[in-house]
Amino acid sequence: MSKVVVLNDKLEKAGELDLPSKYAEVNPHNLYLYVKSYLASLRANTAHTKGRSDVSGGGKKPWRQKGRGGARAGSTRTNVWVGGAVAFGPTNERNYFQKVNKKQKRLALERALADKAAKGVLFTADSLAIESGKTKDANAVIKKLGVKDALIVKDLLDEKTLLAYRNLANCYVVDVTEVNAYLVSVFNAVIMEKSALESITKEG
């Protein structure tokens, strides 16, 4: 069964909690589909080429149809000509959206949490607030746990905690309402407030 590492006020291991057993039983394909959809939604869609109807010029037939001994041509703007159109090229009208059902999103998050718990890098503590708002205090949390990088999940994200973690390249802090399977997967460790973890497991 997947275990969540419980931390005390000094961020030392104080025990373990069990994640619902069904989390580890979720088909990992749900996680794959969600991450694929999430990354697709980030695409900027800037690649754009001009087709036959978009390029200027080429209205006049360059030479007569027969009698020259060369290949026939009706326009200087076909895709085989230099300066001509592009055949089947990308346009900025393409929509990269990939639909993922609400249930699949939920299952993906459950699987992502189960994977982190199985590796022993899913932590929970009563409070993760940085009341000083200082980056050095936030950095001390990560150093104490000895992890490369971490996703910090707060039940109610306050401004001082956000400011404290914002300058750390190896950390990202989110409110529990914004956490998703991609964020959980991309970080080496996940540290959640106990109330945030309870709200997620209660929904499932």
From Swiss-Prot:
Recorded GO molecular functions are:
rRNA binding; structural constituent of ribosome
Per UniProt, subunit arrangement is: Part of the 50S ribosomal subunit.
Q: Single GO cellular component annotation?
A: ribonucleoprotein complex
Transmembrane spans: none
- From which residue to which does any coiled coil extend? none
For the region Disordered, what residue ranges are annotated?
49-75
Annotated InterPro entries: Ribosomal_uL4, Ribosomal_uL4-like, Ribosomal_uL4_dom_sf
| Similarity comment text for this entry | Belongs to the universal ribosomal protein uL4 family.
Biological process according to GO:
translation
Q: Does the keyword RNA-binding apply?
A: yes
- Role summary: One of the primary rRNA binding proteins, this protein initially binds near the 5'-end of the 23S rRNA. It is important during the early stages of 50S assembly. It makes multiple contacts with different domains of the 23S rRNA in the assembled 50S subunit and ribosome. Forms part of the polypeptide exit tunnel.
> Known SUPFAM superfamilies for this protein?
Ribosomal protein L4
HAMAP family noted in UniProt? Ribosomal_uL4_B
Name under which the protein is recorded: Large ribosomal subunit protein uL4
List UniProt keywords, sorted A-Z.
Ribonucleoprotein, Ribosomal protein, RNA-binding, rRNA-binding
Spell out the PANTHER family in the cross-references.
Answer: 50S RIBOSOMAL PROTEIN L4, LARGE RIBOSOMAL SUBUNIT PROTEIN UL4M
